[in-house]
Curated annotation (Swiss-Prot):
<keyword id="KW-0539">Nucleus</keyword>
<keyword id="KW-0698">rRNA processing</keyword>
<dbReference type="Pfam" id="PF08168">
    <property type="entry name" value="NOL11_N"/>
</dbReference>
<dbReference type="InterPro" id="IPR042859">
    <property type="entry name" value="NOL11"/>
</dbReference>
<dbReference type="InterPro" id="IPR048897">
    <property type="entry name" value="Nol11_C"/>
</dbReference>
<dbReference type="GO" id="GO:0030490">
    <property type="term" value="P:maturation of SSU-rRNA"/>
</dbReference>
<keyword id="KW-0010">Activator</keyword>
<dbReference type="InterPro" id="IPR036322">
    <property type="entry name" value="WD40_repeat_dom_sf"/>
</dbReference>
<comment type="function">
    <text>Ribosome biogenesis factor. May be required for both optimal rDNA transcription and pre-rRNA processing.</text>
</comment>
<keyword id="KW-0804">Transcription</keyword>
<protein>
    <recommendedName>
        <fullName>Nucleolar protein 11-like</fullName>
    </recommendedName>
</protein>
<keyword id="KW-0805">Transcription regulation</keyword>
<dbReference type="GO" id="GO:0005730">
    <property type="term" value="C:nucleolus"/>
</dbReference>
<dbReference type="Pfam" id="PF20998">
    <property type="entry name" value="Nol11_C"/>
</dbReference>
<dbReference type="GO" id="GO:1901838">
    <property type="term" value="P:positive regulation of transcription of nucleolar large rRNA by RNA polymerase I"/>
</dbReference>
<dbReference type="InterPro" id="IPR012584">
    <property type="entry name" value="NOL11_N"/>
</dbReference>
Length: 708
């Protein structure tokens, strides 16, 4: 899972008059992870201390001069390096006030970029494709530079990666629509040229990002079509490498949903083995004119975090030490992020319990966008029978585009009927791709038209099992805003990729809704049976029994926390929804941050309900209804621990929480004491089982022998 934290402004930017550029030439890491170097496209280089959000130094060139590549920090000499007017290399220290008085050298060929390398001299890349270390170049600035590139070939992107004492310079070039990758290795000094595969249609790579993992270089590149490919190169040169231009094998990592938009720019940067951050591409369910930063998980093809950014996004993004630097509008924002380990267990978080009976009632899917095999067969059979029976009356099925046009103008009833017919008549393979697109259009209109909310259509689309949170993130937000708990319940039972922030928002919505409002809800029958089994007295509660707006029972019931026949502190329907939240996949650390948004009253109600569940488990109630949908005891304990961690200080000082915390402490202590005594009994029983060793009595005699 991935988390984006609150953004803050580092500095302002001066976008060009045509607003197509942010005015930032580049951002490089400074002397440590808390310092960055911002080079604007005019005349200034500024060093910022990120934690303080303040500049620590700034240098400018004279009027008429122009900075032509981003400034970098030389870790070897602890100096800053920049190029002006393509051929003048300037070197200065942090305590130098005036860049003009610092060292400068004019070289014989245009410099494209100076690239910093950790534990090494910076690498100078010339526009002609030649490469030299900075110290070697400055030793003889006017030395002849031999070109590498062919005529009409120019460099579009470059970077340095390294590991295991090996440094590799990568740069991508373009010539007449063809794209090439050069890999310049320094130990030994070799250069290999690769050709990118051609993407079908008028698409070209627009963003590149490279990382080094193990003994390989992983290059990922983004096309205007929304596809991200990965190519793997060996870190060290191979003796068997062929001469000439080599093919660059690639594999598809991620295909971004473009919708109806046409894109000419965008940027993607690799965060770790599984995650990639993207700007300039549309959010799957955002309306036109909205720009987002999105983090996608390539392994599971899911959108895991997003943040809307105000103003124009210039398709620029940099990443250093867990922070993303993104210019948008008239500011440069810093956004911290965190990515959990990219394994199935981590991506799925704390999973639902999987007992035998549950697995029969809810078959796990091999893919989040695929039906179980038997379900697809049954669906095909039903569809076949229906088609045969009504062949003469069935209209030709709508295409996806026709249905979308119909959704944009028709009334709710017509839309719901059209969606139902579309689902019934569309082949499963086509429906798998169309369900998400149709849902996004329905959500988009529902957000702009308050009178339009096709609940039945949403439920039908959910029933296809072709939706997940990443396909349409705004669906759950819309359902919560409409207080559509029936849709939310089904989504939380089906979606395996709901972010922790959405889980907490849903929990807050449930706890803030009065029980009286929930009693009329249509919820899953099986889940209601669970609550009635767990609180039979409450299911037959008389109308005169008072409840407060959050479903808390009378004070007499609340105080009797050590009683095993404690009544449920919330209404049956609210308990059903809370049970679904308890079984939702999550990761501890991201969830803990969002749980802090709950109010004290909401925390108390939730803790009371968790305590109620734990008491029922102590009575072995869960064994009587184990075939039904119910959270496990470990899930209850995990959530209680997280709530206490998130609100420990508040619960410790709030007067109204004193009795609750005290009763929880008493009950926990009694449980610990009980288990300790049971442990002693178990030890005694084990000792009784051990066979006792038989006592052997030794018989001996003394014989006296007289020799003389």
């Amino acid at each position: 899972m991935a988390t984006l934290y609150e953004e803050y402004t580092l500095c302002g930017v001066g976008p060009d008059k045509n607003s197509s550029s942010s005015g930032i030439l580049g951002i490089e890491l400074g002397k440590d992870v808390d310092h960055i170097i911002v080079t604007n496209s005019s005349r200034a280089v500024t060093v910022y201390k990120v934690s303080d959000q303040k500049p620590t130094g700034s240098w400018t060139v004279k009027q008429g001069q122009l900075i032509t590549c981003p400034a970098v920090y030389n870790t070897k000499s602890q100096e800053y390096v920049v190029v002006t007017d393509n051929k003048v290399i300037r070197v200065w220290k942090e305590d130098d006030v005036n860049m003009e008085k610092a060292f400068k050298a004019t070289v014989s060929s245009d410099v494209l970029r100076v690239i910093a390398a950790s534990d090494s001299e910076p690498v100078v890349l010339f526009s002609c494709g030649a490469v030299m270390f900075l110290d070697s170049l400055l030793a003889s600035p006017q030395q002849t530079i031999e070109g590498v590139l062919t005529e009409e070939e120019f460099i579009r992107w470059s970077t340095v990666v390294g590991a295991e004492h090996q440094l590799v310079l990568l740069f991508c070039t373009e010539k007449r629509g063809e794209h090439y990758l050069y890999a310049q290795r320094f130990n030994p000094n070799t250069v290999v040229k690769h050709r990118f595969e051609t993407e079908p249609g008028p698409f070209a790579p627009i963003s590149f990002s490279a990382t080094c993992r193990g003994s390989n270089i992983h290059l990922q590149y983004l096309y205007m079509s929304g596809r991200i490919y990965e190519s793997v190169l060996p870190l060290r040169s191979s003796v068997s490498e062929a001469e000439g231009v080599q093919a660059l094998p690639r594999s598809l990592c991620l295909s971004l949903p473009l919708g109806e938009q046409e894109l000419t720019s965008g940027a993607a940067i690799v965060l770790d083995e599984a995650h990639v951050a993207i700007v300039g591409f549309p959010h799957p369910s955002a309306g036109a004119g909205k720009d987002y930063l999105c983090i996608w998980n390539k392994h599971f093809q899911t959108l895991q975090a997003c943040k809307e950014l105000a103003g124009t996004i210039y398709s620029q993004i940099w990443c250093y030490s867990g922070k993303l630097y993104i210019p948008h509008g008239k500011i440069l924002s810093v956004i911290s992020f965190e990515c959990q380990k990219s394994s199935l267990a981590a991506a799925m978080g704390k999973l639902k319990q999987t007992n035998q009976s549950e697995s029969k009632s809810h078959t796990p899917l091999s893919s989040w966008t695929a039906l179980p095999h038997n379900d697809s067969i049954n669906a095909a059979k039903v569809k076949s029978r229906m088609s045969t029976r009504n062949a003469s009356n069935v209209k030709s099925p709508l295409t996806v585009d026709q249905l979308i046009d119909h959704i944009k103008t028709a009334v709710v009833e017509d839309v719901q009927s059209a969606v139902g017919e579309f689902i019934h008549q569309t082949p499963q393979t086509d429906l798998q791709l169309a369900a998400g697109k149709v849902t996004m259009v329905l959500v988009s209109r529902s957000q702009t038209d308050d009178s339009f909310y096709p609940q039945r259509a949403f439920l039908q689309l959910l029933d296809t099992r072709y939706l997940c949170y990443s396909v349409c993130p705004e669906l759950l937000s819309l359902a919560m805003a409409k207080r559509d708990f029936q849709l939310c319940q089904i989504a939380f039972q089906l979606f395996p990729d709901i972010p922790e922030a959405v889980t907490c928002a849903y929990l807050k919505t449930i706890l803030s809704t009065p029980d009286s409002e929930m009693e009329t809800l249509t919820l899953d029958t099986e889940s209601l049976i669970i609550m009635k089994e767990m609180s039979p007295a409450q299911s037959q509660m008389e109308e005169g029994e008072q409840q407060n707006e959050n479903g808390v029972s009378s004070s007499k019931q609340q105080r009797d926390f050590l009683s095993m026949d404690m009544k449920c502190p919330v209404g049956l329907h609210k308990g059903v929804l809370l049970n679904d939240v308890l079984q939702t996949a999550y990761s501890d650390k991201p969830l803990l941050q969002h749980l802090k948004d709950l109010t004290v009253l909401q925390v108390m109600v939730f803790l009371q309900y968790l305590h109620f569940l734990y008491l029922k488990y102590s009575q072995d109630v869960h064994k009587q209804i184990r075939a039904l949908r119910i959270p496990s005891i470990s899930q209850v304990i995990d959530w209680a621990s997280l709530i206490l961690d998130a609100h420990f200080t508040v619960l410790a000082v709030a007067p109204e929480a004193k009795s609750l915390v005290s009763d929880l402490h008493k009950f926990t202590r009694s449980q610990v004491k009980l288990y300790a005594e049971l442990g002693k009994i178990e030890g005694s029983l084990q000792s009784l089982k051990k066979p006792k060793s038989t006592e052997h009595t030794g018989v001996y005699s003394i014989e006296v022998i007289e020799l003389f």
